[in-house]
Amino acid sequence: MSSCRYNGGVMRPLSNLSSSRRNLHEMDSEAQPLQPPASVVGGGGGASSPSAAAAASSSAPEIVVSKPEHNNSNNLALYGTGGGGSTGGGGGGGGGGGGSGHGSSSGTKSSKKKNQNIGYKLGHRRALFEKRKRLSDYALIFGMFGIVVMVIETELSWGAYDKASLYSLALKCLISLSTIILLGLIIVYHAREIQLFMVDNGADDWRIAMTYERIFFICLEILVCAIHPIPGNYTFTWTARLAFSYAPSTTTADVDIILSIPMFLRLYLIARVMLLHSKLFTDASSRSIGALNKINFNTRFVMKTLMTICPGTVLLVFSISLWIIAAWTVRACERYHDQQDVTSNFLGAMWLISITFLSIGYGDMVPNTYCGKGVCLLTGIMGAGCTALVVAVVARKLELTKAEKHVHNFMMDTQLTKRVKNAAANVLRETWLIYKNTKLVKKIDHAKVRKHQRKFLQAIHQLRSVKMEQRKLNDQANTLVDLAKTQNIMYDMISDLNERSEDFEKRIVTLETKLETLIGSIHALPGLISQTIRQQQRDFIETQMENYDKHVTYNAERSRSSSRRRRSSSTAPPTSSESS
């Protein structure tokens, strides 16, 4: 749906129409410029009323290209052309014109509300998509900024200054400020999602989109992102049991350690940004194809696509990120109870995480606190999953492609064919040698005969084994891919046969039509022949009659001319020769 407004006799489209449609509207408007109708003055010299003039000026002509639901074609509806109706005479006519203009303007407003602009909806939806993408980017930036500042504050407060210093307070205030901005961005992000839901589903009330599931996830996301170290110095008593000596260890720890580690849960924003920036999600063609195939474009689908395209890169980035984050978390958990500086050292923590990730577990380093043990447990689970994924990726990389399989099968088939021929030739050769040494010699050498018989049996077993290998190779070659290819070939052949049969049926129908026409012509032929013969007979008789008339006329003229000559000869005077 798009609308054009009247501006000086030229319609200028307000929405992004195609160039051809825009040019068509402009040519139509230039050929027939729209002008507001003027009120016609009555016979008595009365002018239009001021209300009619105001209505005529306020209700300027407006063309709305609408697309109603019951019709797919674009219709041009002209509104506001009756604003200044012509007066029948005097002020009464002017008043009538003003009333018609007011009704037309109200009809225009109601029609605008009824026929809402689809182009405007699509543009609004696209703008909401872009705003949601930018909000997600900003949320990730502020979330990562808070994590980085938290790590800096934790490291500096452990080695450079204490929690009661002004620097720690300033950094915590900065973390709190970034967290407040992050929460605001998340709330606005979900507001944009609700607006998108309303645009997509045509809902009028935003409370329709607020399901219990959506409310739960919004509250959970706000709770996860709201956790951060609070400005101030707050401590608690932490009791743990040492690993090897099993002696209890009690120390005073900061509350910040409990509030700092959950901040790494903000990294889920990376998956959201990857989804919103993915070409599969932003491309209209891919989304249309996915909608036709009933595919939901979510983070899981994007991760599967990345694992298919670049599995090594994804696993490498994930493993290194998990390694560094888990090592720092173990260091932060263990530094209050690690008296020998083993696991509280960053390099030592990385070694502990690496042997736990790879499921080796030498036992030279173990965590002392339940926090460190929980991190090591999660690391072991992630390591088992990553190891399985690495094995699957390596196996897929080592697997032959379809073309390589075809080449390998062809080469193996050629070699097995040669081996079958060689084994068959060996069987024939040993058969001939056995016959030669038993039938064609005077004295039979039994040792030589047994040797050839032994070789004969070996050749037979070799021939059987080679044929068995050839059967196995043929069975391996007939994979599901080849069967699917054969099925596609058969489908193409059947489709071709159906097209040919349809063409043949059309030709038969055409031939039947021509035969019917020919039969009708043959049935009409005797009548045409008789009609032609009668016409020719009439023409012949008329010709004969004309010839007869001509002959009679000619004979009559001839007889008259001869009689004239005889009369002239009888009445003429005699000549001198006749008188003598």
Curated annotation (Swiss-Prot):
It catalyses: K(+)(in) = K(+)(out). The chain crosses the membrane at residues 140-160, 169-189, 215-235, 257-277, 306-326, 375-395. Changing residue 397 to N: Highly decreases inward rectifier potassium channel activity. It is found in: Membrane; Cytoplasm, Myofibril, Sarcomere, Z line. Residues 346-366 dip into the membrane without crossing it. Residues 88-104 have a biased composition (Gly residues). Residues 551-560 have a biased composition (Basic and acidic residues). The modification Phosphotyrosine is found at residue 161. Residues 413-489 are annotated as: Calmodulin-binding. GO terms for biological process: membrane repolarization during atrial cardiac muscle cell action potential; modulation of chemical synaptic transmission; positive regulation of potassium ion transport; potassium ion transmembrane transport; potassium ion transport; regulation of neuronal synaptic plasticity; regulation of potassium ion transmembrane transport. Coiled coil: none annotated. Changing residue 399 to R: Increases inward rectifier potassium channel activity. Does not affect inward rectifier potassium channel activity. Decreases inward rectifier potassium channel activity. Highly increases apparent calcium affinity. Brain. Inhibited by bee venom neurotoxin apamin. Inhibited by UCL 1684 and tetraethylammonium (TEA). The calmodulin-binding domain (CaMBD) forms an elongated dimer with a calmodulin molecule bound at each end; each calmodulin wraps around three alpha-helices, two from one CaMBD subunit and one from the other. The coiled-coil domaim mediates heteromeic assembly. Small conductance calcium-activated potassium channel that mediates the voltage-independent transmembrane transfer of potassium across the cell membrane through a constitutive interaction with calmodulin which binds the intracellular calcium allowing its opening. The current is characterized by a voltage-independent activation, an intracellular calcium concentration increase-dependent activation and a single-channel conductance of about 3 picosiemens. Belongs to the potassium channel KCNN family. KCa2.2/KCNN2 subfamily. This is Small conductance calcium-activated potassium channel protein 2. It comes from Rattus norvegicus.
